[in-house]
Amino acid sequence: MIHLLQLSTWIIRILLILFIGGSCSENNKTETKSDYKLPSDSLATTFEKEESDSLIQHLEIPFFQEGDQIVSHTGYTLSYNETFEQANWVAYELTAQETQKAFERTNKFLVDPAVSTGSATDADYKKSGYDRGHLAPAADMGWSSTTMIESFYFSNMSPQLPGFNRGIWKNLESLVRSWANENESIYVVTGPVFTNGMSTIGANQVAIPNYYYKVILDYQEPSLKGIGFILPNASSSLPLQHFAVSIDSVEKVTGIDFYHLLEDEQETLLEKTVCTPCWSWKSTSKSYKSNTTSVQCSGITKKGARCRRTTSNANGRCQQHQ
């Protein structure tokens, strides 16, 4: 009960920050972005619900409005916010097989050629005191040379304090990979929480978020489950459970509608509560070894692509392709 009260108080504090007008006074900020307001009718989509061998295509993609800059790369899709020079969200499916890294980090940060308005650059971050923090982590994209290269696009970066990026944020990324291993595949959406009065860095005025979020959906039968996180852009020694919230809570502070392609009743059930005991909290991604021999599913989607999931079923097909 004490934990729930603390969590409720923490969420209320975030909401006050968002709707009262930013987390720092003007006296402490020499550079600010103009006030940002999300239109009440801004959530729309060009993705349709598309059934393919019982799979929901593009399940990881949040609602977006017509005119939003949506960029698709090999391993992830993002919504780019030109005002703040970073993504509103980065979304991807992460399978157990993809967590087994085949390619090392390039550490070569690149301007994203697919962002029509131009992304941030290395000069924006130089001597700023902030890390070029990955939204979709490089360790999630090590399953091909292309995905690893694309994970270093500046459209996938956000200014993060070193203690946060190399500490609790990295720990959460590792935990998410553990969940992908345990559940065969999960859907991940991650990004910054934009508020009024954010400081900026560089000539392109890259906004410095005060908070970041992740939402995760396990859509593997029999135990469907979802969870969200909101973390301050600061170092922390608190356990990750302290920052766990419902997906609905993340939607309230970001204005983003996650996993909207689910049936309404199912979406409501998965997003309204957070069940921390439903998830394991010890990262095992580095030493993960399957108890069975898993292979890539031999199922083919309607688009003609081979299913990315792994399976230990004797027929070589995952549950969705039985």
PLM feature spans:
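Feature captures the catalytic cores and cofactor-binding loops of soluble hydro-lyases/lyases
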Residues: 311
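Core hydrophobic alpha-helical membrane-spanning segments
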Residues: 15-17
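Domain-level detector for secreted/extracellular nuclease and nuclease-toxin modules, and
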Residues: 2-13, 22-296, 303, 314, ...
